[in-house]
């Protein structure tokens, strides 16, 4: 799908992708940010959409295909139907659904663990394997995950309880993307 060539918002694009997966049995949908060309139709926009939008759509698509998210869940809460470009869709979903967290890493089913920001499919598989033998502690989790700071506010272990972290107003700032801003070469 070409992103940004028309007025379609991210909600429409994700819903269309979900219908393509359901009705045609597609294994993957590709997204490409619109790139304007000189002497094009006047109905096409003159500026290209941010590449981060394409990236967020790929992340949302991944959540639908591998993490069990429904299309409505991903864009739920977005007033204009657009994904938040500042944070990934999984983190944005978790922040909108704070009442579901924190979850116990030693008891939660696979489907619930996959919804925790910072836990991917491989890490969840390792957690499920490890917790059969021993109750996981925060140090064990630190060895399994890429960034414990991203996971910590959303989980409970025998030696860690995030009292007040999940309801903290500063949580959004702490978990904000630390990446650099995309520069515009032709500005």
Tell where the protein language model's regions lie, with residue ranges.
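Long, low-complexity intrinsically disordered regulatory regions enriched in P/S/T/G and acidic residues
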Residues: 38-43, 48-98
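C-terminal extensions
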Residues: 83-112, 138-187
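Conserved strand-turn element in the central/C-terminal portion of the radical SAM core barrel
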Residues: 1-11, 32-39, 43-51
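Residue-level signature of tetratricopeptide-repeat
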Residues: 130-131
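Catalytic cores of alpha/beta
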Residues: 6-22
